[in-house]
């Protein structure tokens, strides 16, 4: 199974732990191509230096030290490639293939940093199907049979809105994680999926920590236990066994 993910900065800020787990997978049946657009690195740099984000700093350090594993392949977008992709051509193609057209005002108010991301995503998701990469792609990616079916992984609502307008498929980190676990048939995922959904359903409060992780809070009277395997002996302390 081949999974092609375009990962933006918000995914690293809110799902760094998940991505770290993906990078350590060594399942020969699974290949995760992780494409980091120029936008991702620049946005993490901004969060680190301008807003003193500890999570962004950790994310950049993680990317610097990241090495390919059996299942995880990292692909970085270079500035030259992003500059070579025409924004006007991207908008033109989007207008041609969309049932709803964007107004000139809607296009003009898009911040430059998001234009960079949209160019990267549209290039990976749509350009190649239109054979427009011949003058753009100098990395010979066109010959790669795995280079198709790209999906944007994002936690940013603004990015999701723009992705919808530009016909760029997107999913959340949690959804990407579920897809990966389903591909490798992780037993812990299968066993705990129903329990996790029940926790989220019964939670009356959600707290988000600095590292992006979410804590679901439930009432004491509604507390319940995780499912235990039907077979097996219940563990008891050694001291209790000796007394009996």
From Swiss-Prot:
Recorded superkingdom: Eukaryota
Keywords tagged on the record: Cytoplasm, Nonsense-mediated mRNA decay
Subcellular location: Cytoplasm
GO terms (BP aspect): nuclear-transcribed mRNA catabolic process, nonsense-mediated decay
Example of a GO cellular component annotation carried by this entry: cytoplasm
Function (record text): Involved in nonsense-mediated decay of mRNAs containing premature stop codons.
Record protein name field: Nonsense-mediated decay protein 4
Species for this entry: Kluyveromyces lactis (strain ATCC 8585 / CBS 2359 / DSM 70799 / NBRC 1267 / NRRL Y-1140 / WM37) (Yeast)
């Amino acid at each position: 199974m081949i999974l092609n993910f375009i990962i933006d900065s918000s995914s690293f800020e809110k799902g760094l732990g998940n991505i770290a787990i993906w990078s350590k997978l060594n399942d020969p049946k699974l290949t995760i191509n992780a494409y980091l657009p120029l936008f991702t690195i620049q946005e993490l740099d901004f969060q680190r230096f301008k807003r003193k984000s500890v999570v962004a700093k950790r994310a950049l350090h993680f990317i610097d030290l990241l090495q390919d594993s059996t299942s995880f392949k990292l692909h970085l977008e270079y500035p030259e490639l992003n500059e070579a992709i025409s924004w006007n051509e991207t908008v033109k193609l989007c207008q041609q293939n969309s049932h709803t057209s964007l107004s000139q005002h809607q296009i003009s108010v898009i911040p430059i940093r998001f234009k960079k991301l949209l160019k990267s995503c549209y290039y990976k998701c749509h350009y190649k199907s239109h054979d427009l990469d011949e003058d753009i792609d100098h990395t010979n990616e066109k010959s790669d049979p795995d280079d198709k079916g790209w999906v944007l992984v994002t936690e940013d609502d603004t990015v999701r809105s723009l992705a919808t307008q530009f016909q760029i498929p997107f999913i959340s980190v949690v959804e990407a994680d579920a897809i990966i676990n389903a591909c490798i048939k992780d037993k812990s995922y299968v066993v705990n999926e129903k329990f996790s959904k029940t926790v989220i359903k019964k939670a009356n409060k959600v707290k988000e920590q600095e590292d992006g992780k979410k804590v679901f809070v439930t009432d004491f009277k509604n507390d319940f236990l995780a499912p235990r395997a039907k077979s097996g002996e219940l563990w008891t302390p050694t001291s209790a066994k000796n007394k009996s």
